[in-house]
Structure formats: C-alpha cells, structure tokens
Amino acid sequence: MSLFEDIGLQPKLLLAIKKLGLKEPTQIQSTSIPSILKGKDVIGESATGSGKTLAFGCGIATHVLPNKGLQALILTPTRELAEQVKTVLKKLSPDLKVMAVYGGVAINPQIHDLVKANVVVATPGRLLDHLERRTIVMSKIKLLVLDEADRMFDMGFIDDVEKIIRTIPKPRQTLFFSATISNRENDLAKRHMVNPINVTATKMVDPSKLKQVYFDISRNLKLSLLIHLLKNEESGLVMVFCNTRRNTDFVEKNLRANHVKAIAIHGGLSQNKRTKTISMFNGAKVGVLVCTDVAARGLHIDDVSHIYNYDLPKDPKDYVHRIGRTARAGENGKVINLLSNFDHDNFARINHEYRFNIQKEKKPYLERVITKRIEEKRHFSKRNDQRKHFKRRR
C-alpha cells in the first residue's frame, strides 16, 4: 500500500492527516485521491467506514479557497452523517468555514451562517428550503459531492437531489460515493457527470477476522437470548440492529430493564437526542447501541466488536452494510444472527446472494425474561408525524 506522501497531497494537508493519527491511505483513498486532485469526476464504490470522507475531503482542502464564498457542496442522506463529514473537513482544513445544514433545528441561525460558508454539508430537504428562500448562493460552487448515493435512492430523496444538482453551474467537479453502485446510480452519473473515473474498494472487512453465527430460536425467546449473550459474550462496543423503530425502542427498553446498558437511535428521535446518543456510544459511556439501518447508515464508529441482528434485514445489501462495521483494522469481529420463523426468508435471501459461511450455534439454557411493552399510542402518533415531515426534516 502507498503512503499519503506518495499521492500528491500538499504539505499542509499531510500535516493535518498526520494529526488525525493516519499513516497509510485506505484502498478507496489511494485509488480515488489522485483523480480527485486532478479535478476529474469520480464514482467511488466503498463500504461505510472505508475512508470516503477523507478522500473527497482532500479534494475540498486542495481546491476550495477561504474567504471566496461557497465553493463546495456535499449532500448527505442524514443529519448525523452531515455532522461527521463537517467534523472531518474542519480538521483537514481549519482555514475553511464549513457548515452543516439539516432539518430538525431552527433555520434562522443557518441563514446567518451561510453568508460566510466556504463548504456546506447538507441534507436535501433543508437545502431545498434554503433554495426556495434564496438564502444560499450556488453560483460559485465548483465541487459537488454526493455521499451515500445509494441511500439517497433508498430514502426517497433522489428527486430532491436532482433538483439541487440542476441549480449548480457547470463546469464543475462532481464526485459520487456509495457503498453499492447499481444501474440507478450509474444512470444518475450519466446525467450529471463528465467522463467519470470509476474506483472500487468494497473489502474493508477481513473475512479471516470475522466470525458469523446464527441461532434458530422461537420468537418469544429472542429477547431472552439477546440478553443472555450480551451478558456472557466478552465484547467491545456492540450494535444491535432492528428493522423498525418500534422494535428498536422495545429492545432498548427491555435491555435496560434487565441491567444491560443500552441506548437507541432511530429517525423518530429529535436531533439533540440523536446527537447525544452518538456521542455517548462513541465515547463508550454506553456499550450497546440499538439502531435501525437508516439511523446507523454512514455513521463512523470505531471499535465495534459485535453485531447482533435482532431482525434480519429484507435487503441482503443491508446485511453487508451491517457486518461491515466490525472486523476492521486487523481486529476480530463477530456477527450474531437471531432467527425466528419470521426471519428465515430474509436469511435465505442473504445466503443466496452472498453465500457467507454462517455457522449454526446451539441455543444455551435460557431464563425467560419478562418483557416491558411499548405504549402503542405514543408510537402511532410519532409515526404519523414522521410520515408527514420525513423529507423536510432530513
């Protein structure tokens, strides 16, 4: 593998990268940064946590000038990812004014700060709000980044994304980064990019370091098994994935009731609550994060040793995204799948698509826990509110 010094970065940027504690570029960084520095359009396919932000961040730090207005726009599907990208960019280039723009918070402070921004990291809904209010000037933008492009499609944001792209002048440099690239992402690239360079680096997880197992268990014992394993498996940080907000809250509430320190994150929480949750988990103040795919996607979290699939995802690609959060940087990782009758079809699709070596484990002796229910009325009203405001709040 090459060194950062070998891929044409400026000394000031090399120093910033050194301060981040990074010594060697990841595969996506070493293959994409040279083309990005040359001003080429790039399509990058790489797993979450593989270093995509640093890759396009080097281009922004090289090409964007301080005190020259808004010159770069990064679109992200979630608020949390917008904040994470902003944090990395500010460390790479402290001279630039980098701003995160997303819904769920007051818009007036954003209007005030946009005047001085050189780089904006935004979710599509709130950025469209600013465009409609004419509180953001796009005429000087020369670099556009679409981060987690596949998730933009999955979350129904792509029409908003296309509206935004059409407001950005040409010529410009356009970068698309995505965990997976399919026909829909390629079609989007054809409409908005010029002779893009394709780079792929999907293997962040070391298969020799990753153990995948499953338990076949009745649905009414699934929570008891999860609690037993969390209390008896030696682990670092743990992520427990559920398919719905309701299950996420149900699992978190019952873990805490059974003396497992856990915290939940999903799209129904306020921005302040989500930010606090991520901070607590990243700081290891709480060892177990219960989450949905949408809420966790794009979050960069180190030192995750165990992934539990309380619910098996319907889309096999989501399974790959989940397990890609462990067995990184030479560390061991373990994926534990809890299968009831409701999960068998999803599990079969995953095995058919990827043919992983997932070993069956024998169910241990379990003491069945008494579960606490989630109040139905509160969740029903929250779901209705989310359906009504989903796009704009993102």
Labelled PLM ranges:
Residues 2-369:
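Conserved helicase RecA-like core
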Residues 365-394:
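Intrinsically disordered, Lys/Arg-rich low-complexity segments
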